[in-house]
Amino acid sequence: MAGAGLIGIRRRIKSVTNIRKITKAMGLVSTAKLRKARVNLEINKKYYNEYKIILKDIINFIEDSNIYIDGNGSHKKLYVIFTSDSGLCGSFNINIINNVINEIKEDKENSLVIVIGQKGRMYLKKLGINTLAEYIEIPDVPTTKEARTIAKNIIKLYSSKEVGEVFLVYSEFYSPVKQQVLINKILPFTKENKSDNKYIEFNPPVTQLMDEILENYLKATILNCFSNSKASENGSRMTAMNGATDNANDLLDNLDLQFNRLRQSAITQEISEIVGGAEAQR
């Protein structure tokens, strides 16, 4: 009986050891990817913040009617959701999906969705939520190529009045253990009051450059979301894999203890049987 128990525990020890090797390797890979993602995030964040300042000045000094500021009359809302292509990253994806569901549940008829990432597409399909477009297999370091494709699609949907508001839903990265889901409205722009002592002259007139300015701003904004999303994904995966490795270590300690106790019990029983047999021979 003890022998069968020892064999079962030995199998479990082997299984947990193999799992620990996988989680440890994935944790190391995620750590390396996170380091690269954080460098990319810092670079993109500087560019994005500077472009926001420039755009703010441009928007505030546009006096002519413009659909990108005044709206286009459509009541449809577009949500662009940033999720991951791979799993095993804790609650990273489900937190984003839950926030989207809470946003659209009050007005499903006027809510449209573009999803980025295999996992987001899978969750939305299970929930019966249709998507306007899907973008998958985004590289670990996203480029302007991916951002431009999405930006052009957003501009097309907005300028054709298929959507009247555009929101980006992504995970803002603060640290490997802290990320926050944000819902950022990017269209139409919010115009602020002009400063009385500030005057900017644009040449050529800014209205002639509006389409180019809009596309560049959307590219910068989408790249910023990509960078935050990739850093958050890898931070969540690193934390999840490190936690899984720690749990595997604890489980192995318990299994080793059970194995040693069972083996000791088997040895004690065997010695008792030998002694008992010897006594019977007398």
Curated annotation (Swiss-Prot):
The superkingdom of the source organism is Bacteria
One GO CC annotation = proton-transporting ATP synthase complex
List, in alphabetical order, the Gene Ontology terms for molecular function in this entry: ATP binding; proton-transporting ATP synthase activity, rotational mechanism
Subcellular location as annotated: Cell membrane
Asked whether the keyword Zinc-finger is assigned, the reply is no
Instruction: Give the GO terms filed under biological process for this record.
Output: proton motive force-driven plasma membrane ATP synthesis
Entry's family note: Belongs to the ATPase gamma chain family.
Biological role: Produces ATP from ADP in the presence of a proton gradient across the membrane. The gamma chain is believed to be important in regulating ATPase activity and the flow of protons through the CF(0) complex.
**What quaternary structure, including any partners, is listed in this protein's UniProt entry?**
F-type ATPases have 2 components, CF(1) - the catalytic core - and CF(0) - the membrane proton channel. CF(1) has five subunits: alpha(3), beta(3), gamma(1), delta(1), epsilon(1). CF(0) has three main subunits: a, b and c.
Identify this protein by name: ATP synthase gamma chain
**Protein source organism:** Clostridium botulinum (strain Kyoto / Type A2)
